[in-house]
Amino acid sequence: SSLKLSDSDKGKVLVGKGALEDYIAVLSQEIYGIHHVKVIVKLEDQCIDVRINASIEPGINIPETSGEIKSNVRETIKKVTGIEVKEIELFFKQIKAKEE
């Protein structure tokens, strides 16, 4: 499934759900201490709901890091696609060091 970014007499621009999920996973992993990210996007009416499942390194401040992830995802998705991110739910499945 996909979300329409624009529609004109010259054609449509769509972005796929999978493309958004992959991009949000990359954005989430840009934040220090976050790894093993899986993203689920739910398409709404010209906006999206996001669930991010991730692991976080021990000793990382979870509330602060969660805020960074949410801000980064919201701002970047809006800037790059024009899509509003309605809700972001974060689930940390593990507090564990990243294995190299």
Residues covered by each model-derived region:
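Elongated extramembrane "stalk/tether" segments
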Residues: 1-37, 42-45
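Cytosol-/stroma-facing membrane-proximal "stalk/adaptor" domains immediately downstream
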Residues: 58-100
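Short edge beta-strands and adjacent turn/loop segments
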Residues: 31-57, 92-97
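Short amphipathic alpha-helical segments at helix-loop
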Residues: 5-9, 53-58
